[in-house]
Amino acid sequence: LNDSANTTRMPGKYYTLEEAKELVAFCKAHHMTLIPEIDMPGHSAAFIRTFRHDMQSPEGMKILKLLMDEVCETFDVPYLHIGTDEVQFTNPRFVPEMVSYVRSKGKKVISWNPGWHYKPGEIDMTQLWSYRGKAQKGIPAIDSRFHYLNHFDTFGDIIALYNSRIYNKEQGSEDLAGTILAIWNDRLVSTEWGMIIENNFYPNMLAMAERAW
């Protein structure tokens, strides 16, 4: 997966296992919750190029479980995000089986909404990414629907973020877990620092924090 031949953006850019562990330690020292995301089964073209198997195939699921073993061992954190957005599901067993497997490793599981449709108890938390995403009673939701930064979108305007309300509610609840401000560079930015600058990350982060306290 780390081979530059299998990636289309920023070849050779990845975290080593030691760097990943250092990042976990840094976040803990600064009282932040790190949530690793391993996109499945969508946004996984590099997986297919590397292993020559679709994630939803029996062979792909075997490989993915081995990767989850390594991820769960490397990241000493409570949550793991599994994606499940923007994909056609061809294997109805895929998501339930992967959620169960990650939970068996002692992790709570987060999934995008819209994505796979869960009932209470089938997932630990969802993250709303589109106006079509709806919080479900009994499943805590993170509201990121209009709280993401992309220098081609207007949602990340600092004034709009400051004046927004998380899920249009005055305060959180057992079903509303807050917000995450995400940088989604659908248009390629050449460097990591360029992403921070072009998306006006720090001012926007502070504005959104005022809504989330």
Annotate each PLM feature.
Residues 1, 116-121:
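Beta-rich nucleic-acid/ligand-interaction surfaces
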Residues 53, 69, 75-78, 121-126, ...:
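Structural recognition of alpha->loop->beta junctions
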Residues 119-122, 129-213:
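Flexible, acidic glycine-rich loops studded with aromatic residues
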Residues 38-44, 86-88, 115-117, 130-132, ...:
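Active-site-proximal loop/turn and secondary-structure-junction residues that shape catalytic pockets
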